Amino acid sequence: MKKISLPKISIRPVIDGRRMGVRESLEEQTMNMAKATATLLTEKLRHACGAAVECVISDTCIAGMAEAAACEEKFSIQNVGLTITVTPCWCYGSETIDMDPTRPKAIWGFNGTERPGAVYLAAALAVHSQKGIPAFSIYGHDVQDADDTSIPADVEEKLLRFARAGLAVASMKGKSYLSLGGVSMGIAGSIVDHNFFESWLGMKVQAVDMTELRRRIDQKIYDEAELEMALTWADKNFRYGEDENNKQYQRNAEQSRAVLRESLLMAMCIRDMMQGNSKLADISRVEESLGYNAIAAGFQGQRHWTDQYPNGDTAEAILNSSFDWNGVREPLVVATENDSLNGVAMLMGHQLTGTAQVFADVRTYWSPEAIERVTGHKLDGLAEHGIIHLINSGSAALDGSCKQRDSEGNPTMKPHWKISQQEADACLAATEWCPAIHEYFRGGGYSSRFLTEGGVPFTMTRVNIIKGLGPVLQIAEGWSVELPKDVHDILNKRTNSTWPTTWFAPRLTGKGPFTDVYSVMANWGANHGVLTIGHVGADFITLAPMLRIPVCMHNVEETKVYRPSAWAAHGMDIEGQDYRACQNYGPLYKR
């Protein structure tokens, strides 16, 4: 089956069409802007899968309807997912703009004095606003000379931010969310909303009963040689934690081996269901070999599966990580408890950064006073105002241990193409696999346990659906916190100590939901959240309006908020603008 091509970025150089001197004097400068933009994007960006980003430049500068149509014809067969229009001069607004209603688009108007690039930018954006096709504005802060071919830092930042978000939009379009199972324990996010996926993300939902996973395991619809490789890998790399179950619920060596085997098989089969696997065609399972074209998935697990079969913790943790028995590779996106809305936040984070995502319960707010009462320890530093305990039953990406290192030696999580095998091994070495607690998981399983290193910048996100309003996005930038070991042990043992932990301190603003740490916890819209490495809230804020999803809560500096220019016409308060504009334009793929 032919592999689906990755979306490309199109660069549209537009020009003043007046011949006999005007156009001729601008051709080289205009095309050089397009080439410089393409060079920047191809050098600085990659797809989440690690592949190089490709840019397609119009064959000619665009002065009017005919050349705009020729450009569009070229792009239509190149799988263009977003467009950037560039110009140093005046051009004819409605005659030259990109009119595709679902493709993210930006316009860079050169800030120079010789020709009025800013005038075209304003004129073209006015057309976009009037026609209901929002576009992003890019205009350098400082005037440049006409022969200056450099891209200023502020322009570069907007080009890259727009492109990252636009590629995320284009990469999700046409893919599917694999809903493996149904509603888990009444969790709202696992009431999978097909209209949300179709209308806002351009995706389909593939609903599959968990009996399909059982069938694939029981009928050996998998690569048996790969299973042996996975078992060998686990035997080499897995460290096992204590079994906290009562004696009557503890499994012997043979039973534990069977649980491990099935857990690894679950990972293999869920991956095959998402992506397909040509090896299955070799055993006459052609239909199953195709997969479901899923860019994200969720596994219900509890309780209809976990009351009798091993839980999904091991499978989900491995799939969400950047490595397995096949080595370092792109992490998948698999949501615990089929929480599709948290899965979408994971998907957004992965597409924006290329990194693995940490799925977690937003479990407990610990005030400084409560911690001092319980442990005798006084919080300081990043944790001085209190912390939030992020913990889930062992399905978080193992990258979340932060045993990878950046160029300065700091703990981090990296895109898979930057991760060494030694760093993958370090993440595995930092993880223990603890037998699942019988009271929760009667079918057994193994939960991963690690502790995230402190001082690492993270962005916590969540998508919620509000009846009458639609989807909204929450964003909280902050840091992981490292507590003294004895303090961590006391706090951790008050909950389930067999699960992975991140102590999180959000950055406070003193206002609204970020007045204090308690307010962050109190305003979080659901029981789950996602950690994405870095302070990348601004990228989420740029992605959200492309899909027409308003941001209901964030602590990103106002100077970093970058949305389509038409948002400014929806009032003077930038967050109210966001709600009114998203309501006005409606979901990107209106249904």
Curated annotation (Swiss-Prot):
Its cofactor is Mn(2+). It comes from the Bacteria. The keyword Cytoplasm applies. The keyword Isomerase applies. Mn(2+) binds at E337, D361, H528. This is L-fucose isomerase. The lineage of its organism: Bacteria, Pseudomonadati, Pseudomonadota, Gammaproteobacteria, Enterobacterales. It comes from Shigella dysenteriae serotype 1 (strain Sd197). Keywords: Carbohydrate metabolism, Cytoplasm, Fucose metabolism, Isomerase, Manganese, Metal-binding. GO terms for biological process: D-arabinose catabolic process; L-fucose catabolic process. Belongs to the L-fucose isomerase family. InterPro entries: Fuc/Ara_isomerase_C (IPR004216), Fuc_iso_dom3_sf (IPR038393), Fuc_isomerase_C (IPR015888), Fucose_iso_dom1_sf (IPR038391), Fucose_iso_N1 (IPR012888), Fucose_isomerase (IPR005763), Fucose_isomerase_dom2_sf (IPR038392), Fucose_isomerase_N/cen_sf (IPR009015).
